[in-house]
Amino acid sequence: MGGMGGGGLLDIYAMAWEHLRPGSSPVDWCEGNYLISSNIAEFVNTFSNFLFILLPPVLIMLFKEYGRFVTPGIHVIWVLLIVVGLSSMYFHATLSLIGQLLDELAILWVFMAAFSLFYPKRYYPKFVKNDRKTFSWLMLLSAIAATGLSWWKPIVNAFVLMFMSVPTMVMLYTELQRVSDQRVYRLGIRSTTVWAVAVFCWINDRIFCEAWSSINFPYLHGFWHIFIFIAAYTVLVLFAYFYVESELPQRQPLLKYWPKNEFEFGIPFISIRNPGKALRNTI
């Protein structure tokens, strides 16, 4: 029995090492491997995640008021974006299966956290009974289930993420039809445009790699990282605005830009014109 147990443990260690091994992921992007550095598989794809690391701390600062008077959960999302960046850097540096899973799961948890906080109640399923805490528990259980499935069948991740991203953009379009603030509407148009450019980069890198490599530019996945971060965080800012407008209108949300409010290509954030008392039991 002891020998069998030891053998089983060795098998587990061997499997874990296989998943950690560089190149163990079935996914390989267009950029050539180990061309710039002998220690980093995809150099450009690795360091093009810089916005995921640099900008969330700024967003945490800008959303300090929002976190105090609307929901502190907004800061969880900004921290999760850092996790996405670090996971993506690890994946592209190693092309390991564990890196791929960490990258995809971090994105999944950003979606679930955002849905928990900002998903409009009018789209809730009936059994949730219009209760955000119940819906948040549903999202948590869904995230745990999807995480388990992803380790069992990694291919599940791609389908889950695609299933969530397209309806999110459709929902953004629907919400934009309801807003009266033209600054918010313009940000929505810019976010959607950047998202479309990001998807264009992803598809071209994945499907037309040979064509882009023929002109010595196999770096579109790196641009995907930059554009998708801009699209993702601006969409999150928009849904943070929609949430207050819909459920806490007395707070009077206002879209602003940093460092100069008049410059609409700065960093957007939500200011609260009528803070009132800090909320205690907000998810």
From Swiss-Prot:
Molecular-function GO terms, alphabetical: metal ion binding; N-acylsphingosine amidohydrolase activity
Disruption phenotype: Discrete defect in the ellipsoid body.
Localisation per UniProt entry: Membrane
Ranges annotated as spanning the membrane: 43-63, 69-89, 98-118, 134-151, 154-174, 187-209, 222-242
Residues annotated to bind Zn(2+): 92, 221, 225
Annotated binding of Ca(2+), by residue: 28-29, 31, 33, 42
Disulfide bonds, paired cysteine numbers: none
Keywords: Calcium, Hydrolase, Lipid metabolism, Membrane, Metal-binding, Transmembrane, Transmembrane helix, Zinc
Tissue specificity of this protein: Expressed in the central midgut of late embryos. In brain, it is present at the interhemispheric junction and in groups of cells in the central brain.
GO CC, any one term: membrane
Primary localization: membrane
Pfam families: Ceramidase
E.C. number(s) listed in UniProt: 3.5.1.23
GO BP annotation list: brain development; ceramide catabolic process; regulation of lipid metabolic process; sphingolipid metabolic process
Obligatory cofactor(s): Zn(2+)
Topology within the bilayer: Multi-pass membrane protein
Recorded catalytic activity of this chain's protein: an N-acylsphing-4-enine + H2O = sphing-4-enine + a fatty acid
Superkingdom, natural source: Eukaryota
Membership in a protein family: Belongs to the alkaline ceramidase family.
Protein's job: Hydrolyzes the sphingolipid ceramide into sphingosine and free fatty acid.
Annotated protein name in UniProt: Alkaline ceramidase
